[in-house]
Amino acid sequence: MFMGEYLHTIDGKGRLIVPARFREALGERFIATKGLDHCLFVYPLDEWKVLEEKLRALPFTQPEARAFVRFFFSGATECELDKQGRILLPANLREYAQLDKDAVLVGVSSRVEIWSQALWADYSRQAEDAYASAAESLVNLGI
């Protein structure tokens, strides 16, 4: 399981250090793709395969499903850790997530999210305001 928040710098070649706490759970190879809210989603291969099967089962005749699957998979790339524990983020993913220098890696249960520091700060402020009402809504779901 992934949890926590870590600030790291992206170097001039587009490489980002993956926190040691995330490395073992991610494994040597994993998948990064365009996430929601202009962050990147990073999945261990086993989690990716489960998600891939669910997305493959969506009806391609439905425009929303087709658009989501197309966008999600078009940004997907297999990543490997180098000997220094870094990943190379492709330019298209860095551009999508507005990643320039400072990145925040966030553990979200079954995945890691990579955010630009500025977008994460904005998102966190907004999420903090909605946190209490979201908690109240989750009570209705038995959580």
Curated annotation (Swiss-Prot):
<dbReference type="InterPro" id="IPR020603">
    <property type="entry name" value="MraZ_dom"/>
</dbReference>
<dbReference type="InterPro" id="IPR003444">
    <property type="entry name" value="MraZ"/>
</dbReference>
<dbReference type="Pfam" id="PF02381">
    <property type="entry name" value="MraZ"/>
</dbReference>
<keyword id="KW-0677">Repeat</keyword>
<dbReference type="GO" id="GO:2000143">
    <property type="term" value="P:negative regulation of DNA-templated transcription initiation"/>
</dbReference>
<keyword id="KW-0963">Cytoplasm</keyword>
<feature type="domain" description="SpoVT-AbrB 2">
    <location>
        <begin position="76"/>
        <end position="119"/>
    </location>
</feature>
<dbReference type="InterPro" id="IPR007159">
    <property type="entry name" value="SpoVT-AbrB_dom"/>
</dbReference>
<dbReference type="InterPro" id="IPR038619">
    <property type="entry name" value="MraZ_sf"/>
</dbReference>
<dbReference type="InterPro" id="IPR035642">
    <property type="entry name" value="MraZ_N"/>
</dbReference>
<dbReference type="GO" id="GO:0005737">
    <property type="term" value="C:cytoplasm"/>
</dbReference>
<dbReference type="GO" id="GO:0000976">
    <property type="term" value="F:transcription cis-regulatory region binding"/>
</dbReference>
<dbReference type="GO" id="GO:0009295">
    <property type="term" value="C:nucleoid"/>
</dbReference>
<dbReference type="InterPro" id="IPR037914">
    <property type="entry name" value="SpoVT-AbrB_sf"/>
</dbReference>
<comment type="subunit">
    <text>Forms oligomers.</text>
</comment>
<protein>
    <recommendedName>
        <fullName>Transcriptional regulator MraZ</fullName>
    </recommendedName>
</protein>
<feature type="domain" description="SpoVT-AbrB 1">
    <location>
        <begin position="5"/>
        <end position="47"/>
    </location>
</feature>
<keyword id="KW-0805">Transcription regulation</keyword>
<dbReference type="InterPro" id="IPR035644">
    <property type="entry name" value="MraZ_C"/>
</dbReference>
<keyword id="KW-0238">DNA-binding</keyword>
<comment type="similarity">
    <text>Belongs to the MraZ family.</text>
</comment>
<keyword id="KW-0804">Transcription</keyword>
<dbReference type="GO" id="GO:0003700">
    <property type="term" value="F:DNA-binding transcription factor activity"/>
</dbReference>
